[in-house]
Amino acid sequence: MNAIWIAVAAVSLLGLAFGAILGYASRRFAVEDDPVVEKIDEILPQSQCGQCGYPGCRPYAEAISCNGEKINRCAPGGEAVMLKIAELLNVEPQPLDGEAPELTPARMVAVIDENNCIGCTKCIQACPVDAIVGATRAMHTVMSDLCTGCNLCVDPCPTHCISLQPVAETPDSWKWDLNTIPVRIIPVEHHA
């Protein structure tokens, strides 16, 4: 019985010693995060889609802050995110990467063919922004307002019932080019 207590005490002392060493090492050798990277990462949409060429939003934020990467490569965030990052870094805003001024690619949204959906939830698990709703063995649907069109839900679908389709243009989503609209100033004549 005495040997058991000695073994318990020895293991407890070893655990306490190693815990103290690990606690000291975690504080002594801690790596401080760059606050600029944190702020950029908060601005990015966290869709982790990889359209910028990086595996996620955090690596892209690090590349912007540390490597001088362009701030205009986030497709899901679009112009709003690019403008916020430009304001944060005090740099000049740039046109979105790959976007020709005259020819903007149509915004895409995932659409589920609900007649063929088997309710496997693989698309829900793949969606980084939780834009797909449904339950196991029940019909799923996409909330188009939340969908970023990242295409991550298409491949996991075993029945191939998910496709990306362009969003229909409405007066609210239309990008009005006010510089090309002809404006004529009509002089006002005052008659007494």
Swiss-Prot record:
Chain residues that bind [4Fe-4S] cluster 3: 127, 147, 150, 153
Residue stretches making up the 4Fe-4S domain: 32-91
Subcellular location: Cell inner membrane
Any one biological process term the GO annotation gives: electron transport chain
Cofactor note: Binds 3 [4Fe-4S] clusters.
SUPFAM superfamilies on file: 4Fe-4S ferredoxins (SSF54862)
Positions with a binding annotation for [4Fe-4S] cluster 2: 117, 120, 123, 157
Region Hydrophobic, annotated ranges: 1-26
Keywords assigned: 4Fe-4S, Cell inner membrane, Cell membrane, Electron transport, Iron, Iron-sulfur, Membrane, Metal-binding, Repeat, Translocase, Transport
Domain of life: Bacteria
GO cellular component terms given for this protein: plasma membrane
Pfam families in the cross-refs: Fer4_21 (PF14697), FeS (PF04060)
Record-linked HAMAP family: RsxB_RnfB
Entries under PANTHER family matching the protein: ION-TRANSLOCATING OXIDOREDUCTASE COMPLEX SUBUNIT B
Name used for this protein in its record: Ion-translocating oxidoreductase complex subunit B
Gene: rsxB
